[in-house]
């Protein structure tokens, strides 16, 4: 038996396998290029992915007690929830405070610098609820539109809301919303936060929120322009991802007319509070 035919046969098989591998690679490159040019919906259809499934989530990002070192304390919350599909969702947000004790009116104001009648009494201070339609416009950003209703002492207000939220570069969560009220008033709110993982369970979260108003509203202790800036840092321990106690510090600075109105009411242009609470979601 001569070895040459066997070697030739092996070489022929190797060449066939190499050609087949090249063809598979070319097909994969073509598919990848086609998918890169597809829209998200076309890609989902091509890959036979079901993008009509409905799902939801509720998160209390801040559910805490704050103490500024005086006779008054306050419970505060910042929560949101959504339900819908991959592209469109119903999105609900709420935030506010429940004040106890008898500190002065200006110190009983919320992060927007607002105070209502009887602000020295216990009760809800300037809570609000937003009901929004959420639409995905990119892998990182959503556009939102809907309405906001304010609650608490004094005259309540109804606002139309349009905004955008998502992940900015370096994984900062960012949110910007503009409002117009049924009385022609305008406002804007900017928020940003970032999760810095110290360990797999210990997370440091810086947070910032700024509120701006188109015109003064003395009844709610609001001046025009930049009304206030809240900056806080919270350190949480994730017992589970969905359950994390935390401690933190919250600093609020009022500006311009809002600071003047706070001083006129006997308060300060800034507050510094310690916070302890829970971050939960389900």
Q: Residue ranges of each PLM-predicted region?
A:
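Outer-membrane beta-barrel initiation region
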Residues: 24-106, 113, 117-122, 127-135
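Transmembrane beta-barrel strands of outer-membrane/channel proteins
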Residues: 62-64, 92-96, 145-149, 176-180, ...
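Repeated loop/turn-to-beta-strand initiation elements of outer-membrane beta-barrel proteins
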Residues: 87-92, 139-143, 170-174, 199-204, ...
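Residue-level signature of outer-membrane beta-barrel architecture
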Residues: 83-85, 135, 166, 180, ...
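Outer-membrane beta-barrel "beta-signal"
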Residues: 233-238, 268-282
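Residues that define the transmembrane beta-barrel architecture of outer-membrane proteins
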Residues: 54-56, 73-77, 125-129, 156-160, ...
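Outer-membrane beta-barrel translocator domains and adjoining extracellular loop/strand segments
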Residues: 72, 103-111, 117, 124, ...
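Detector for outer-membrane/organellar transmembrane beta-barrel domains
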Residues: 156-218
């Amino acid at each position: 038996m001569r070895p040459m035919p066997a070697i030739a046969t092996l070489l022929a098989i190797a060449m066939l396998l190499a050609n087949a591998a090249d063809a598979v690679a070319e097909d994969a490159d073509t598919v990848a290029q086609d998918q890169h040019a597809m829209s998200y919906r076309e890609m989902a259809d091509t890959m036979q992915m079901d993008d009509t499934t409905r799902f939801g989530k509720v998160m209390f990002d801040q559910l805490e007690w704050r103490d500024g070192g005086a006779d008054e304390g306050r419970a505060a919350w910042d929560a949101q929830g959504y339900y819908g599909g991959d592209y469109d969702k119903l999105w609900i947000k709420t935030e506010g405070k429940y004040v106890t004790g008898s500190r002065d009116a200006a110190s009983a104001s919320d992060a927007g610098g607002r105070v209502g009648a009887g602000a020295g009494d216990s009760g809800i201070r300037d809570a609000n609820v937003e009901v929004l339609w959420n639409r995905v416009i990119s892998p990182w950003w959503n556009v939102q539109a809907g309405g906001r209703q304010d609650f608490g002492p004094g005259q309540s207000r109804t606002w139309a809301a349009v905004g955008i939220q998502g992940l900015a570069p370096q994984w900062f969560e960012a949110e910007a919303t503009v409002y117009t009220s049924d009385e022609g008033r305008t406002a804007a709110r900017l928020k940003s936060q970032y999760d810095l993982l110290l360990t797999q369970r210990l997370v440091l979260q810086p947070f910032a929120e700024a509120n701006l108003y188109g015109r003064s509203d003395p009844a709610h202790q609001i001046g025009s322009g930049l009304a206030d800036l809240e900056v806080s840092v919270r350190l949480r321990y994730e017992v589970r991802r969905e359950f994390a106690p935390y401690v933190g510090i919250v600093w609020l600075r009022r500006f311009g007319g809002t600071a003047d109105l706070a001083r006129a009411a006997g308060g300060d242009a800034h507050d510094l509070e310690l916070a302890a609470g829970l971050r939960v979601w389900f």
